[in-house]
Amino acid sequence: MKNIIIIFFCMFMLMFQATAQNHADVKEIEVSGIVLDSNKDPLIGANIVVKNVPGLGVITNIDGKFKIKVELYQRLIVSYIGFESQEILIKDKKTLTVIMQESKSSVLDEVVITGTGEQKKITVTGAVSSANIAHLNVSPSGNLVNALAGNVPGVLSMQSSGAPGQNTSEFWIRGISTFGAKTSALVLVDGFERDMDDISIEDIESFQVLKDASETAIYGARGANGVVLITTKHGKPSKITISAKAETSYNTRTITPEFIDGPTYASLINEARITRNEEPVYQPDELYILKNGLDPDLLPNVDWMDEILKKGAMTYKASLNITGGSTNTRYFVSASYVEEEGMYKTDKEIEKQYNTNANARRWNYRMNADIDITKSTLLNVGISGMLKKVNDTGRGSSLVWNSLMGQTPVSIPKVYSNGYFPASEYNENYRDNPWIASTQTGYRQNWTNQIQTNVTLNQKLDFITEGLKFIGRFGYDTNNSNYINKLKAPERWKAERFRDSEGNLVFKRLNEEQKMTQSAGGSGDRHEFFEAELHYNRVFNKHHHVGSVLKYNQDSKIRTYNLGDDLKNSVPVRHQGFSGRFTYNWKYRYFVNFNFGYTGSENFAVGNQFGFFPAFSMAWNIAEEPFIQNNFKWLNMFKVRYSWGKVGNDNVSVRFPYMYTIGSFKNYQWADFGFNQSYNGLTYTSVASNGISWEIAKKHDIGLDLVLFNERFSLTVDYFNEKRTGIFMSRGSLPLTVGLYDGDKPYANVGSVINRGWDGNFSFNQNIGNVSLTIRANATYSDNEILEKDEGHKLYPYLYETGFSVSQSRGLIALGLFKDWDDIRNSPTQNTWGSVEPGDIKYKDVNGDGVINNNDRVAVGNTNRPSFVYGMGISANWKGLDASVHFQGTGKSSFFKI
């Protein structure tokens, strides 16, 4: 054994000596050079690397020059962003002059991100939309979701609030297809499920929307409502580059109701009273005093909108990006700040102590590092976070607006002349003194803190077979939110409608002062992700392009505090899935694609926990046919697409619906009439639904992609049809005789909705002299209908929601005004909501029962969600100077509430 070891040692030393001798025989030289553009200007930070030698490379200096030591007959690769790379063989020349040519980008070579990674747009067989990041960057909104409006085909959005920090739009991909628990899309940032609201636009490299089943099936149940893929910026091999940006915008109120002034209001009140044969409220001398502002305490004339609201408010945005790195280590670091000022006017004295306005501040940071561990191993490490502070008035913005809309201009002054605060005679929630509600009730603060970490390992496995690659991902996120409410109320007075003998006001105190109180709380969650993917891409005989992906994923989300004794919600929410994709194309002419997702969910009982969801797509690029290429050279791409797929949704409104829940019931009375004894016991608070399973969506998509006239004109249009069945809902048709109230009834898969529509976009590019002009537009239309819903018994067919859109608005039909008392007496009874007098609105008795009530409400208008969204823009570039304009709008929506 000893001899064997000695022999192996001697052989190793001989091999080492031979290798060292061979290496010494290779001549190493120093190569210097300069890298220039086509105008002979130096390119700073160009990359010069030795081919097939990881980590060996340099970067050009401020003069575009470089030096590097290489062996003879090695190759140098010279690259620079926006230019074509060059490969140079080193023979005996030691000084190089490299002239770089600008890369000729092509729409056909455009790369999009899909569920399985990067691929050329020409090879996409499903419905995928991309956002132009440059257009999002010029949006005045500090919120990414708001910036999407009218910029991305297939995305419908609606902003329901303008309050700072609470003004994020809701968005849906291709509209609403369910009335179940979840309608929002899956958002993935660098492959990890994240919230899109608080991402800095400055950090985004690419933004894609996956809309049909063939693109989302690989995500299983998570992709039922569409998928958004966001890729953040990464570093490039270059010297350190620092970029900073600061901007400000002035935001005005969109639509503010205009109210009449005090004298007009008083005159109309008198007119209404006289019409009803009643005494007028205001006498002529009081109208004179009111008109001339002679007694602002007893006869005020207050423009509440002007007293409470500013004309506009500022938004400030700033960002700082640092990027750079070497050939084997690259980094991107960013920080950003957004501040949205509030629209309310404030009490200057109180403002010295604390902030009562509605405003928001947000800080974002991000670090992405890419490390080439070996020639075939890439490690990506990402850390990002967000800190947000939202401030609001003590009563909250909604109650401030209720007060603004409900208070009359003549009821009370803003503040009495002696400094007393006027009390309102009405319900404080609706007709409180707006100045008190907005400035004198304390403040509310909410702090949100997010920390997101992720690691991705990309390992090429070409040593097994060419084109094989492994990708592993792990992410760990923490989210915490804390609030503090400091509330108070001032002493409030009412001035009597007379003065004392000395002419002083006589006051009556209606509300005692409430000292400031404090309440606080918080919530949080922890989210873990893991994914493992195996990719294979290969080209056979130059024409057969084959690709496949196998993916395993699991995630777990748990609330970290504020659980109390809530046992159900203390259990982590978990998902698990296995999915795959197979793709094939021949000569970029014919394409087929098959996907599947096998997903598990804890929301269903054993036997229903896993679902299989397949999808396929095909495409034909007619422009690649020889006849077209020979006779219609102006036709660059003419691709028709079709896809079909089935996807599942497990987002239900309750946890573990297949389990019974038992709770206590107190003071239950039973036995004969008049028996007053009560008992405590147990009862079902929810009944198990053992048979429930996945909400299923079957989706069809037909698409057309056109690129014409040497890529000057491009058009994409899709028609989609989706039928959602098995929607999870409570069994409304069960009668009360079964012993269950509405909140206790079991759930079942009994709902159905169909959603149809189209989306598309086009662009036109033209160079006119030194001016580069681009015209673009996009539009999305969707229309849904409820086919089945377990609503229970309705007295009249038109009261059912079935047959109408999800969230259809309903109301009474107005026929005009009551002319006189005879008109009232000869019309159906209409006193359900109060007494009726001449001049009031007359409503239609739809069911003909002689009474106007809730049974006469019918579908009116549309839903409050827009069914049609469009956007258009023009941009021009002249010698590096850019100018652009963007218009956006919505249609087929009704913004009212009855």
Model-derived features with residue positions:
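Short solvent-exposed capping/turn motifs at the termini of beta-strands
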Residues: 29, 35-38, 62, 193, ...
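Cleavable N-terminal targeting peptides that direct proteins into the secretory/outer-membrane pathway or into
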Residues: 1-30, 71, 84
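Membrane-proximal, glycine/serine-rich, low-complexity loop/turn segments characteristic
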Residues: 20-27, 117-186, 192-196, 214-448, ...
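Short, acidic Ser/Thr/Gly-rich low-complexity loop/linker segments typical of extracellular
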Residues: 54-65
